[in-house]
Design a protein with these regions (language model features):
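Double-stranded beta-helix
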Residues: 29-31, 105, 125-156
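His-enriched metal-coordination microenvironments in redox/metal-binding proteins
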Residues: 46, 58-63, 77-88
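Short acidic-glycine-tyrosine-enriched beta hairpin
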Residues: 59, 94, 100-121
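Positively charged n-region of N-terminal signal peptides that target proteins for export
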Residues: 1-4
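A short, N-terminal "cap"/entry segment at the start of jelly-roll beta-barrel domains
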Residues: 19-64, 149-156
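Bacterial N-terminal signal peptides
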Residues: 7-18
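Short beta-strand His + acidic residue motifs that chelate non-heme Fe in jelly-roll/DSBH
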Residues: 76-78, 96-97, 118, 123-129
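Glycine- and acidic-residue-biased ligand/ion/polar-headgroup-sensing regions
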Residues: 71-74, 80-101
Length: 156
């Protein structure tokens, strides 16, 4: 039950952004976006992280794409998502590990151009030592479930 509450809270945090005006919706026409056109918003479910929704909304069962901008020295505890996650590193270095326990010694450094693909439900964690931007592709609705609900950064 705690996992469901966490997922609902995260969807609500993403949903407020996904339903806002911006690039997040289009009518099936060709879409081209430059980095200068992205609108960055605070991400309540990950305090300190910014999100730019490119395609969405994140609350519906549609293709989604968004960028996450992590500050330096940030970490996200072990968690999973209900859909497949494709993440491409745009800038900086995202250190990613797999499993239920956060362990910096068991991560791989993903530098610009690197890609990670995780099946639904894969437990993983990340950390940064510098500002890092990653672009996520998936199918909504998007949510995050923490392995340990007490680790949810939005609750701290």
């Amino acid at each position: 039950m705690k996992h469901i509450a966490t997922a609902v809270a995260v969807i609500a945090g993403f949903g407020a952004l996904a339903l806002s005006e911006g690039l997040g919706q289009h009518s099936g026409t060709h879409l081209m976006i430059s980095p200068a056109e992205l609108t960055w918003n605070d991400l309540p479910s990950l305090p300190g992280v910014k999100i730019a929704v490119i395609e969405g909304p994140l609350t519906q069962a549609v293709p989604i794409m968004f960028r996450l901008k992590f500050p330096a020295n940030y970490q996200v505890p072990p968690h999973s998502h209900p859909g497949i996650e494709h993440i491409t590193i745009i800038s900086g270095t995202l250190n990613m590990g797999m499993g239920d326990v956060f362990d910096r010694t068991k991560t791989r450094a993903l530098t610009p151009g690197s890609v990670a693909i995780m099946p639904p439900g894969t437990h993983h964690f990340v950390w940064t030592s510098e500002e890092t931007i990653g672009q996520v592709h998936s199918t909504g609705p998007w949510s995050v479930t923490y392995v340990n609900p007490a680790d949810d950064p939005s609750k701290k």
